[in-house]
UniProtKB/Swiss-Prot annotation:
Taxonomic source organism: Chlorobium phaeobacteroides (strain BS1)
The protein's name in its UniProt record: Translation initiation factor IF-2
GO CC annotations on file: cytoplasm
UniProt region (G5), positions on chain: 554-556
Region G3: start-end pairs: 464-467
Biased composition range(s): Basic residues: 262-272
Domain tr-type G: 408-578
Sequence positions that bind GTP: 417-424, 464-468, 518-521
Function according to Swiss-Prot or TrEMBL: One of the essential components for the initiation of protein synthesis. Protects formylmethionyl-tRNA from spontaneous hydrolysis and promotes its binding to the 30S ribosomal subunits. Also involved in the hydrolysis of GTP during the formation of the 70S ribosomal complex.
Region Disordered: start-end pairs: 80-142, 153-172, 195-309
Length: 911
């Protein structure tokens, strides 16, 4: 089901946290409202959540108001930050202006000078006067008019238009326009007096510039503060705009001088903050470098470095967040003890016991806790519980192999595709043996693992998976252990559902696909159509510009098989498949298939993935352990050891493992037994709790009997993979009225225990490629039990479907059989009204159900009380004849009414 189709569910504790109320209050309300919940970690649906929000509406309103206030506060803070940022940018612009023109920016006079004419000083005193950083002169004549220059230097009223323009750039508030001709002088530009006189060298200039930096920064900071305050006052007063100053106005000049001097006096009264000279120089250098690098390769490199730095910081933050989240997650099995849970959380067991006591549960240090209790305890101590299987919890840790220890290994290739598309026939030709002859119905029903040697000492391990839809789990397991998938599609058929499923399994496991279009020797073969359908399924072959290799083959004639093998080996070389071939490392593998042999015991097919598996190695696999008694290849020949990518049959298991379990060699029998026992204890606890719940559920079903019918089944098969495929296929067959209930499933022959269980639970026994022993057969005949034997899996599914359809209530259909018209009404004493009718169509029977229609409206529905022709009682009347009848319990009949006869027909339902 898609996520859109699922109904949203909410945890009670999360709802309580959202409303900021006690979870117990919410739990109490849900129980009163009729909700079936056990604890505060239980889930409720959307309607119940809406009911909770309505009940706690006052609390929700308070929470919403608090959230709104918090958001408004955050908005105000963000606005203040934005305002501070803009203020900082203005300061930076002022500093940039200074760094670009330090001597012009220093042209503002610092003292108020009277407007009277001042006598010019001698020329020899000029260096001392001009040495101040505020002085910039304006001259229009050569050096002999130095007196006039000195006069203009001391008079701020007679500043030139260029000097005023510089001041406008700095202040950004008032635009000044000063007459160009003052005192009879013509202004052409500004001139640095010291440079014009040729006094002082480059070293003196640098020293003077450094001395002036601090004073300039102080002045600019004071002026900026004054301007900002004045601008704020003006905005408060109504934001009146300043009028431009007219040319030639003496009042304007006086006002300008007075306002400038007043601002400077006001600025002097305020204590200047001390600014570090190194900070100023650093800011100026960074600003200048930024202005210089606004374009070109340097700017792009700088941006790239900055982006890389931001990305690294972001990656570090994400990694830290992931580590923090992982630290707060504990991986625990479902029925862990209080002591084990305390060890995982790093606390004392007594703290868990105390917390359970406050919850109303009395536990001991070795008592096993259920899932809900573990979640609540972990949440209380700030952890999130992630439940894992008992195998994952006791997983054996291994040291990772070094790169120099790895060697090239043969690829593991899985052949996938739809039923009867030629997967096993392809493997037949490669192995030069007839595998199909050994399979019932000509279809593969096990995962077969085979090793094939090609030219040049090259080897490939093949896994042949079933193509029938019941073997979805098998195909998924095959995709997990494989390196390359050969997708077989018949050229005379099309891309079928199992073909698409195989593609999805391969893509989900990240396994490359090599397409083999089979049966090209047939006359109706159409490989191009197959390629088109594959492209629609997301597999675009290389011939069409895609990335998937494709080869047209004929598995019967051998056409294109060698080219297909070359493409598989090429794909393997690209992937650089490696494994550790050292004999010192403990071996590891995957159990592909497991079965119970009458003479050998438990036999499992293991695909070795690391190291060499030898006879005598102790191992653990899933819930069982053992010691390797014998190793055999796929042809039954005994071998001494098996290396990576080699399939091998292993004897020596104490119990039957499950397909897909991890096979790990242990240092000793004792360690292997300890791990297996831990897993068995957890599994037994899980099965015990589950069986208890099943019994309670069955009691509830007995109370509601009649709502659901069940077909109880006991499954016995030859291999674990077949059991899983059968169980998956049968559990899919159900509807709202009937379903299959698997009482027991196992590998091996049918025993007396199975027969007794079937007799007690009224179940049928299904044997898939297994037979009962003598005692079980005799007992089954005595108990008159239904025992069925099959060798093809879809025959089992078809028979179970038919059995379930027989348990369904039939559909009832109404079938019209005839209609009569009332043409006369007779009143008969002690009987009532009798209708004289004419049979319009069909037939009417004495026991027929009838309805009375008047003007097309039904006014009676019942049965006939009598049916006569003339004075004789009859069983039926055909069309075209007249008859008399009266209705049982009804006498209000009139001329012109229609009597319609019908019967109820039962129709068999389908699943």
């Amino acid at each position: 089901m898609s996520p859109e189709g699922k109904e949203m569910r909410y945890r009670i504790s999360d709802i309580a946290r959202e409303l900021q109320v006690s979870p117990q209050e919410v739990l109490h309300f849900v129980k009163e409202a009729g909700g079936k919940v056990a604890s505060t970690s239980s889930m409720v649906k959307g309607p119940m959540r809406d009911l909770i929000l309505d009940q706690f509406s006052d609390e929700k309103k308070l929470v919403d108001e608090t959230r709104k206030i918090r958001e408004e506060k955050q908005l105000r803070l963000s606005r203040l930050e934005e305002q501070s940022r803009k203020t900082y940018e203005k300061e930076q612009q002022l500093k940039d202006t200074i760094s670009g023109r330090p001597e012009r920016a220093a042209a503002k006079p610092r003292t108020e000078v009277p407007s009277e004419s001042v006598e010019p000083e001698p020329v020899k005193e000029m260096p001392e006067t001009v040495a101040e950083p505020e002085v910039t002169g304006v001259v229009s004549e050569p050096d002999e008019n130095v007196a006039a220059v000195a006069e203009e230097v001391k008079s701020p009223v007679e500043e030139t238009s260029e000097t005023v323009a510089e001041k406008n750039d700095v202040e950004g508030q008032v635009s000044y326009e000063v007459p160009q001709k003052i005192g009879g002088l013509t202004v052409f530009g500004t001139l640095d007096v010291q440079s014009s006189l040729g006094m002082g060298g480059e070293a003196d200039k640098k020293k003077q510039r450094k001395k002036r930096f601090k004073e300039q920064a102080d002045e600019l900071k004071d002026e900026f503060d004054i301007k900002a305050k004045e601008g704020g006052k003006e905005r408060e007063a109504g934001g009146e705009s300043r009028k431009p100053v007219k040319k030639g106005s003496e009042e304007t000049k006086k006002t300008t001088v007075e306002s400038t001097s007043a601002k400077k006096k006001k600025g002097k009264k305020k204590k200047k903050p001390e600014v570090d000279e190194k900070t100023i120089e650093k800011n100026i250098r960074s600003t200048i470098s930024g202005m210089d690098d606004t374009s070109g390769s340097g700017s792009s490199r700088q941006k790239f470095r900055k982006m890389r730095k931001i990305e690294r910081e972001k990656e570090l933050e994400e990694a830290e967040a992931i580590k923090e989240a992982e630290r707060s997650i504990i991986r625990v099995t479902e029925f862990a003890t209080a002591h084990e849970l305390a060890d995982l959380m790093g606390i004392l067991p007594k703290e868990i016991i105390q917390h359970c006591f406050t919850m109303g549960k009395f536990v001991t240090i070795n008592q096993r806790l259920d899932k809900e209790t573990i979640e609540l305890v972990a949440m209380e101590f700030g952890f999130d519980a992630e439940f894992v299987s008992e195998v994952e919890a006791t997983e054996v840790t291994e040291i990772e192999d070094e790169e120099e220890e790895l060697e090239i290994r043969p690829p593991v290739v899985t052949i996938m595709g739809h039923v009867d598309h030629g997967k096993t026939s392809l493997l037949d030709y490669i192995r030069s043996s007839n595998v199909v002859a050994g399979e019932s119905g000509g279809i593969t029903q096990h995962i077969g693992a085979y090793e094939v040697s090609l030219d040049g000492d090259r080897k490939i391990t093949f896994l042949d998976t079933p193509g029938h839809e019941a073997f979805t789990a098998m195909r998924a397991r095959g995709a997990q252990v494989t390196d390359i998938v050969i997708l077989v599609v018949s050229a005379d058929d099309s891309v079928m559902p199992q073909t698409v499923e195989a593609i999805n399994h391969s893509k989900a496991a990240g396994v490359p696909i090599v397409v083999a279009i089979n049966k090209i020797d047939k006359p109706d073969a159409n490989p191009e159509k197959i390629k088109t359908q594959l492209s629609e399924a997301g597999v675009l072959v290389e011939d069409w510009g895609g990335e998937y290799q494709c080869q047209e083959i004929s598995a019967k004639q051998g056409t294109g098989i060698d080219a297909l093998m070359e493409k598989v080996l090429t794909e393997a070389e690209i992937r650089e498949l490696k494994a550790n071939f050292s004999e010192d490392v403990p071996s590891r593998g995957i159990i592909v298939e497991a079965e119970l042999d009458k003479g050998k015991g438990v036999v499992s097919t293991v695909l070795v993935q690391r190291g060499f598996l030898k006879v005598g190695d102790p191992f653990v696999a899933g819930h069982t352990m053992g010691k390797v008694r014998a190793l055999m290849d796929e042809r039954g020949k005994r071998i001494r050891e098996a290396g990576p990518s080699q399939p091998v049959s292993v004897l020596g298991f104490e119990d039957l493992p499950q397909s897909g379990d991890l096979f790990t060699v242990m240092p000793s029998d004792r360690e292997a037994r300890e791990i297996a026992q831990k897993r068995q204890i957890i599994r037994r606890e899980h099965e015990f709790r589950r069986s208890t719940r099943v019994k309670l559920d069955s009691i509830a079903r007995q109370i509601k009997e009649g709502l659901m019918k069940e077909l109880s089944v006991i499954l016995k098969a030859d291999t674990d993979g077949s059991i899983q495929a059968l169980a998956d296929g049968l559990m899919k067959i159900h509807n709202d009225e009937v379903k299959v209930q698997i009482i027991h499933q196992g590998v091996g022959q049918i025993t007396e225990t199975d027969v007794l269980l079937a007799a007690a639970s009224d179940a049928i026994i299904i044997g898939f490629r297994v037979r009962p022993n003598v005692n079980a057969k005799r007992l089954a005949e005595k108990e008159d039990l239904d025992v069925r034997f099959y060798s093809v899996i879809y025959h089992v599914i078809e028979d179970i479907e038919q059995a379930l359809e027989g348990m369904l209530s039939p559909e009832l259909h109404e079938e019209s059989i005839g209609s009569l018209e009332i043409r006369q009404v007779f009143k008969v004493p002690k009987i009532g009204n009798v209708a004289g009718c004419y049979m319009l169509e069909g037939k009417i029977f004495r026991d027929s159900k009838v309805r009375l229609l008047r003007d097309g409206v039904q006014i009676y529905d019942g049965v006939l009380d009598s049916l006569k022709r003339f004075k004789d009682d009859v069983k039926e009347v055909d069309a075209g004849y007249e008859c008399g009848l009266n209705l049982k319990g009804y006498s209000d009949i009139k001329v012109g009414d229609i009597v319609e006869g019908y019967r109820i027909v039962e129709k068999k339902r389908k699943l």
